[in-house]
Amino acid sequence: MQKDKGLDEIDRRILRVLRKQARLANNELAEKVGLSPSPCWTRVRRLEDAGYIDSYVAVLNQAQLGLGDTVIIEVTLDRHDEDQIQKFGQALAELPEVLEAYLTTGEYDYFIKVAVDGTAGYERFLRERLYKVPGIRHSRSSFALKCLKRELSPVP
């Protein structure tokens, strides 16, 4: 979707509030952004219809689920043809531990963020899942020590 230059400051306020508190009732949202409920509801529907709001999601607590460690993995494939890239991307999409995966430029082909239960959980993920995906030539991993910022999306 192309950037809509029609976003005004109230639209941006709505998006900022919903980004953090998607379960707010319309009356509460309207109060927070300085609108009455009816125009607020209309604006939210317009933002949804225009594609600015893709979905409303629950952000799960990884530690509570026994997956308190985040690992960033950089992967290089042995081939770079379209078929290999397609198959590798499909395989990543099927791995439940994978939170995010990006095809990238630079030294590595992929940037993958996974949630695991410690080093033992990470070793299990590598042996039983990731390294069974064909085509990996090299990987490098880093455990995240602390999350300093996490946003699902920016608001201009």
Predicted regions and their residues:
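A compositional/biophysical signature of low hydrophobicity enriched in polar/charged and small residues
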Residues: 1-156
